[in-house]
Amino acid sequence: MSRRWKAIGAFAIAGVVAAIAVTAAAAHSSSKHSTTFSGTLNIMGFGTNGDDVAKNRFAIAQKAVAPAKVNAPNGGFNEQQFLTDIASKQVPDLVYWDRSYVGTYAAKGALMPLDSCIKSDKIDTSQYRQAALQSVTYNGHIYGIPEFFDVRTLIVDTHVADTSGVTGKMLNTANPTVLKQAALKMYQHSGSQVTRIGFDPKLPEFFPLWAKAFGANILSKDGLHPDLNSPQAIAALTYANSLIQAQGGYNAFLAFRNTWDFFGSDNQVAKNQVGAWPMEEWYYNVLASSSPNVNVTAIPFRSKTGDPINYSTGSAWSIPKGAKNAAAACQWMKTMTNASTWETVANIRKAAYAKAGQYWTGLFTANSKADAAINKPTSGEPKKWASIINTVEAAEKYSFALPASPASAQFNTAWTNAVNRVLQGQQSPTQALNQAQKEAVAAIKQATKK
């Protein structure tokens, strides 16, 4: 299961959730179907350990495919095992994985296109966010049903910003010059040691976000033509890297960042060790549970044109070619990702949070209908958390994703390694991205070789 829910912990609310959820599966009636399922549904990559959202959705989906049995060993997707399964023609019926895998395995012919599944089970694809669907669509066919939906906004420590004379208007990624000034106002050091990061651009992970903000599309819509060394992409990397170099340089910057108690009560916001940085939405849950009284807010990430943007990633369900129980797999995917299932488990969690005195900070999925219903501030919730939910929910509407590609892994490796070479001073942004472009072109050419 996604780290977002493991991160916020099963801690004190675990017992409450269990008590509330006892009748959840029995009460849920939205997944009625006419097909009678049988045999065993074998799933790879989905676990429920310590995760109430996963457990409750699992129970609902399990009921939907009954009397078929469900075999889902805890643990994430194992690519080496999956390759072995494909070679031996003993594939699981369903895989749960990062959406970046979908294009690669669809191109290999290892996945079933879901056209007939979507039609026979009447799966409403309009409920899923377009950015999520784009990342599971290859050569005109859908090969995955999207699940979670990462939303990246700027997390701002308002205490650090206020005491440094930095306003929200200055923390505007649409204005690189002013943003850098704000970063340096919040940055602190003692000699060569960094003691506070003013602004962390989150490299290499968020390079696609910076590239998009500067006007670059680093991969074509069909996933076949990389454009990693465009002037816009080079400018984006040059700027984002300059933020780190201006704050002590990469080694000192990274050394300090590695000291953060990221998931604990002494996290970098609670200890005022960072001014602002782009981050996925699940981290607000971490803050709300570990340090609910921190001074924090959310600001949209904006392109140089001033428009809000979000680089979305997330998980998906896919059916391998040769699956023996594809009918049950299709029903499982539909049930796990439909709006009524999300609403049921969200309400269970909300009730548990309320009983435990914890603040609700949202559950963000690839299902826009579900999110509209569940991501509303609860009564009595502090304004800062309510504001954060609203900001994240709004950001979902401005999302883009990297298209499905036959060489997604190699493409991601190419740009990640390029950014790392720049951070470590081994190459200039132009040199690094020129090399990455050659590597990506070669990888896609090899992957599409007949």
Where do the model's predicted regions map?
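Helix-loop-helix "hinge/cap" segment bordering the ligand-binding cleft or interdomain interface
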Residues: 118-119, 137-206, 216-254, 321-327, ...
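A local structural motif
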Residues: 64-74, 90-91, 165-171, 221-225, ...
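Short helix-initiation/N-cap motifs at beta->coil->alpha
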Residues: 73-82, 100, 174-178, 254-267, ...
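Conserved N-terminal structural module of periplasmic/extracytoplasmic solute-binding proteins
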Residues: 2-104, 119-126, 305, 340-344, ...
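Extracytoplasmic/periplasmic substrate-binding proteins
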Residues: 206-209, 214, 237-335
